[in-house]
């Protein structure tokens, strides 16, 4: 390090290394120097960080109205109109409640009306957009979002995950900013798999069913939970992260296979013998919209768990038209995604209308919903995606109905030969 008494040629900025002659001014500190250029650069960095922090703070107070939330969901999620409306209202009311609680002073809190939290239960078949709806909501609201699988959870003290590990995922999604995590969204999937195995309470302990429901009660309602920072089981010599779940929105979802029979029996819509009314699978799925708490209790959810999920909404099985729309219409439609991938190799990808219909029909036949569309696209395009990057002659790939249904190769259109090559 250069000293003050040395020649000016030896004095250099400790950050960029420029000499005193190369800069306008060199500021001396205790054993270090900084030039005017580095000072200006540091000021720019600080201003950018402050601006980013301001944007984050302002985004936290940007609460869209239900119609705006619905409109955003419309851009990305096809169908499920009733579910989108219910979710838009429920999410708006939840965060309106959060803002109201944050604005109340300690003195006003005594006399103010306390609004209870309204968690959401989503019921519907697999591949119909339950998880995607929740993910899209979180992205619009700019809040931390975590997905958990209820089947991995067990009651405390047994092999498996504790319910507190769900909260750890949310904290990790918020980059360990606990305050931000406390206003996030947790999506718990496969909640129907933790239903009690029998309608009557069992003598033996149901550690992955009723036991998990009991363990979830407190965090659903709102409590200060102790979360192990590295996950896993708690032990006494470990530091814990304290998180308040009062303002965390829980969206729990499941397929609830067999629930339609319970609803139908309760409503008297099932009969036996030759006089029994005929009904289709579509009628069964529409029965979900008539679900009552007593049906969920008979399915295997305990009353206390049902009571903490006051907003119940359903999604319906996607038909061919809806799957066709999912393939082509949303901003991140599956067809557009694959077209973009081919574009990166300089190749244009096209689909015949009949090919898209065949893909949608296959997804309906396999009963995999929207989730199965990508698997079918991979089956159809996999071989050609292997060949295209190695060939410079391919200009266009056209996917036909035969390529989908008969494993035929998609049509390959080569580049047009240049005029010089023609004249030769």
From Swiss-Prot:
Binding annotation for ATP: 125-132
Pfam families linked to this entry: AAA_2, ClpB_D2-small, zf-C4_ClpX
Family annotation (InterPro entries): AAA+_ATPase, ATP-dep_Clp_protease_ClpX, ATPase_AAA_core, Clp_ATPase_C, Clp_protease_ATP-bd_su_ClpX, ClpX_bact, P-loop_NTPase, Znf_CppX_C4
Claim: Nucleotide-binding is one of the keywords in the record: yes
Keyword line: ATP-binding, Chaperone, Metal-binding, Nucleotide-binding, Zinc
Functional summary from the UniProt entry: ATP-dependent specificity component of the Clp protease. It directs the protease to specific substrates. Can perform chaperone functions in the absence of ClpP.
PANTHER family with a match to the protein in the record: ATP-DEPENDENT CLP PROTEASE ATP-BINDING SUBUNIT CLPX-LIKE, MITOCHONDRIAL, ATP-DEPENDENT CLP PROTEASE ATP-BINDING SUBUNIT CLPX-LIKE, MITOCHONDRIAL-RELATED
HAMAP family attached to this UniProt entry: ClpX (MF_00175)
UniProt name for this protein: ATP-dependent Clp protease ATP-binding subunit ClpX
Organism: Leifsonia xyli subsp. xyli (strain CTCB07)
Gene name per UniProt: clpX
